């Protein structure tokens, strides 16, 4: 009879790799994930990274605990480095769980796979672990920037709140635009003469008239007093325009077929209600977003810039996440899509243009911010724009105007991005030095006077002046 194994309650599992780092690559799935483990010892033992151990675990709390138990059996948690591939939103829960345990997490935009027949989740996970091992342990450089790993920095509280709200607002705006396009198409069939009197057929007063009187015949027979009551206090449509609208409705060439007319009227009524509901939700979101931006330190900094409003500031905060994600102002400009690209061959400089990459939303938002600052006139950004236009843009004698003014906006947007980065970076460094029990000082806002002094040549850096370099002479030891 075989002897039963003696169990010792005082024995504890000791990690295999106590003094070396463990690199974990995780292939993300919807229901299950696959983790591959790689280290210098494991690579020497198995000779190939494809033969290193792997673990399949579920996308649940029990699965996450199983992963942590397996990791602890191999190495301490402070020696763990995890790499995941961005795949939609499925990686976010695991990323948050690992960061709560103070595990260093890296992400990669897309994984480069060899063109072969073999494609398994285990191989993908071990390939990610090998990428992490090569770039962190061996310092291997990769020519493709999409293959670079990037450490995940938790977003600020304001960025975490605004990310979902800004994304939802963008979707509501998109749906609202779709409804407006459909309503415009219906108006072209039912009452094409409406746009001759009313500039926007989807305006508030126009929608109220179209909802109350969906056909030109119904609009032509109503009294002027009723139309004035529907118009309310809005003066965008005068009484004369209302009379002209009735005259156009009486002789409208809109569709008259009864079957088609009933379908268009029903569709128009439903679309108007959907559009009004979407606009109401957008107003609620704007109010919530404005409150978050006003109370956030990053929001106060961004709102101090001329031309930047609450929605622009909220979009910037949500896109940046944490300013520690960007090591320099050039990285932030590249992410915003306002970095210059130089085409050069030898000693010849062919041309310089703006990069085609970057976040499209941020590129659009920053363009609007610069354009609004230029329209305000009385600020340093507008003066910089006017000076650059006279310097960089050719003057057309025939039209007596400068050509290519929009190209100068890229230069102004780049400098505004640098100023935003400097203030956000300084504020983040200031907060990192404040003890938890102490209230932080107010943030340093954009100061037009300091900006004007900078442009005049009196530059004052935001960082404290480093101590001057000194040379200390060491006297030789006396001869014994």
Report residues per predicted region.
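A detector of single, family-specific signature residues
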Residues: 1-480
